[in-house]
Amino acid sequence: MMFSKRKSIRFNPEGDYTELPRGGYVVPSKLGGIQFGVPPETIKDSMALKIDVPTIYVFPEELWDRKTGINAAEAEFPAYFNYFILKRKVSFVCTKEQEQRIRIVFQETLLGPPEFNTGIIINSSSSTTDTSKTSPIKKQTSSSSPPLSPQQQQPPPPLVKQPSQQQLEELATMDTCHYHHHHHHQEVNDNDNNNNTTTNNNNIEILEQQQQQQQQQQQQQDEDSTDVDEEFQKEFSSTFPRSEIPNLEKECKYLRTFNSVDELFDFILFDDNGIAKLSDDVEIHFQEDQSLFKVLQFEETGKGNKVQTLVATIPSKILFPDMINSISTINDNKIFDPPTFGITIIGSSHGFDPKKSTTGFVLWINKRGIMVDPPLNSSSFLQSQGVPTRMVDHIILTHCHADHDSGTFQKLLEEYQITVVTTPTILGSFLRKYGALSNLSTDLLRRLFIFRPVMIGEPMIISGAEFRFFYTIHTIPTISFEVFYGGKSIFYSGDTCYDPNRIKDMNKRGIMKTSRMKFFLRPWNHTVVLHEAGVPPIHTPVSVLRALPDEVKNRLYLVHISEHTLPAGSGLKIAKEGVAHTLSLDVMKSSHSEAVDILKLVESVDIFRSIPLTQACEILQTATKRKYSQGSVIIARDTEPDAFYVVASGVVCVNIGELKKNLIVGDYFGEMSLVMGGLRSANVQAVTDVEVLSFNKEDFLSITRNSTESIQFITRLWEMRNEKSWETMSLNSVFSRCTNSQKTAIQSILVRELIKKDETLWCKGEEALFGCLVAEGSFVFKEDDSLESFSQGSFLGDINAMTTQPPSIHKTTVVAKEESVIYKVLSQDLIKFFSNNPGIQLAFLDTIFVDALRDQVQQLVNSKLTY
């Protein structure tokens, strides 16, 4: 199995199928469309293509794509849409092992953390519908379950016929309270009507009942203070009254419209022969050795006989569109200048809107970005509008529904470790959910990022601004926040059910504390209010927001809403997406903001990473900001070196011979000739208007002189730049996707070494002290000489063995087929590189080689920056 990845077969689908824009395929059958691969927001593809939203979903061989960071089994919204909107169940076709993993995902996203399911029951009227009656697929708990009867194989009855496109959009955005099993809102209104028509005797009886309810409520609230989990209590400040800590389990269950995840879906499992029987007439065959699925169904021959026909052949490893991250230099050569305090909306809609992205935004503080619930491919979105995502160094994760966390995992795998801000409860759900999807341990996932835990009831300083976080009213633990900076403030609601009637009802039932009720009903005294207006009953009804005073609506921007559901003449407005619509608040900059800007920029420069804090003062005193207009020459070839530069904004192009590289914020240039001597070897020109941080020659040498690590870094880099290391990395299937900064960091840990023909690189059983990038020649594994040889661009090395401490032993023996050249990397250096580049670490994980691009076509690096 060590070499299975090299032997895996990739082919194009064949037969009758529809390819989906976001990835995956839909194959027609007697049972309706069968979808293979389930990427985030996949139902939007069906809606946009005007095809029926499938009820049968086949999970691919790998549930998560390491290359793109995309979840290939995002089954949440297909299940939600079919269950809540179309009133029917879905069927998931997969292996037994995949079923167990998917159940963990739905546990977290539908029911919340396991400790939230202690058996508490919310008393209310119920009219639960058996939705399984409308499902065309019978529940099968194992692959040996009997096939469906002919009656069960029939399409859904007319009442659940697939709606038209217009009906789908209306259904997906209407008030779905009539789907809600508990009818909380209706109960409040009914009670109000009854109170107006009762007799005096009944009024007295009602008053007595209300007094009794109040006593029971107080008693229940006293009991709740001891019911709350001890670990959950630790998320609240020591000054937060223990009696006022919310019972989120009760609040979540009040909003929940089901009692078990099995109400939403069934599983159909592949048997030991790789066959999943959907019915007597329809089967899916999984041929693992060929990496494919086959859809087969029986057709009548006309003589009472049936013949099995092949409908389609689909790859079992779904390829998703690879969003090549490139910084745009269009838009009149202007580069985005982030506000000191403001918001850039990436997406403003929800998971059922085919025309818009799910809600997520960048909160700008001191020109640094904090991404809140990043939508999928959010970095590509920003870069397409001229915003380097290196400007974003924090993520706020509000909760673990797919429309809010799908892009979070992807964002964690980008350049540098990012800081995640959320509560331990929400982070725990996130790690369990994505640990199950990726099949990686939660310990490993936790090491991919820096965690800053939220403390409820206590101010938190992030990027110089003061944050206060709260738990909202939602079906799983969710946070919102308010942030204060420079005399202005922004409030973000997060996903919440802001409905005064229901909030009061929760208090009346003893589900919500009175102090918490008053908190949610308080006025919004903030400069800007960013509030959700999603699909009730678990979101905020637009009618409630429409009734707000005009003074509030002037400061209110809506998210989590589709455009066609905004009532005309309501005085409400949807937050506009894109950099051009960035909302900037006029605030006074902090007296330290300039120094912070410089230090944050210098922090990203490899050369300065080993510089002690005691030299920070020297850096601040010697750094100078310079501006260059578009087209200006910053450095001319064959001139005397006089300064070192760090890009602060804009894009510059470095031209060395035939090699061109675009550099962006945090990239640097001009260091080589300062340290190694000689004239400038490159031309550097401003592609856009540019601002750089410059250090003159004497100051730069003074800062780095006493740092052995800095000098060694530059020396190694100089040696590798005289090699063809950059071109060689561009031939590797993983390194080719690295940013310029990452490639530079890799160059600094490589050492050239000549290997003779038939020389052994390492033997099986030896300690894994190094790996290598093949620069010239070729190598083979003795354990499997039937493989093609590994040539230029291939990386060889047992990554798991190299990255344990101390390194463990090699499982293979590698021999040179001819005289070769390698770029050697020590295990200890690779570990350090991985710690700063978690996405590359995951791409290498569990490998003994990372193959060269099979077509050996070198990626061009002179048109756009791969980022």
UniProtKB/Swiss-Prot annotation:
Cofactors that this protein relies on: Mn(2+); Mg(2+); Zn(2+)
The record's EC number reads: 3.1.4.35
Q: Which UniProt keywords apply?
A: cGMP, cGMP-binding, Cytoplasm, Hydrolase, Magnesium, Manganese, Metal-binding, Nucleotide-binding, Repeat, Zinc
Q: Which domain of life is it from?
A: Eukaryota
Q: Which GO terms describe its cellular component?
A: cAMP-dependent protein kinase complex; cytosol
Q: Which GO terms describe its biological process?
A: adenylate cyclase-activating G protein-coupled receptor signaling pathway; aggregation involved in sorocarp development; cGMP-mediated signaling; chemotaxis to cAMP; negative regulation of actin filament polymerization; negative regulation of phosphatidylinositol 3-kinase/protein kinase B signal transduction; negative regulation of Ras protein signal transduction; positive regulation of myosin II filament assembly
Residues annotated as binding a nucleoside 3',5'-cyclic phosphate 2 are 734-851
Annotated spans, Phosphodiesterase activity = 357-503
Q: Name one GO molecular function term.
A: cAMP-dependent protein kinase inhibitor activity
Question: What does the cofactor section's free text say about binding?
Answer: Divalent metal cation. Can use Mn(2+) or, to a lower extent, Mg(2+) or Zn(2+). Half-maximal activation occurs between 10 and 100 uM of Mn(2+) whereas maximal activation occurs with 10 mM of Zn(2+) or Mg(2+).
The principal location of this protein is cytoplasm
Q: Any idea what this protein is called?
A: cGMP-dependent 3',5'-cGMP phosphodiesterase A
Q: What is the lineage of its organism?
A: Eukaryota, Amoebozoa, Evosea, Eumycetozoa, Dictyostelia
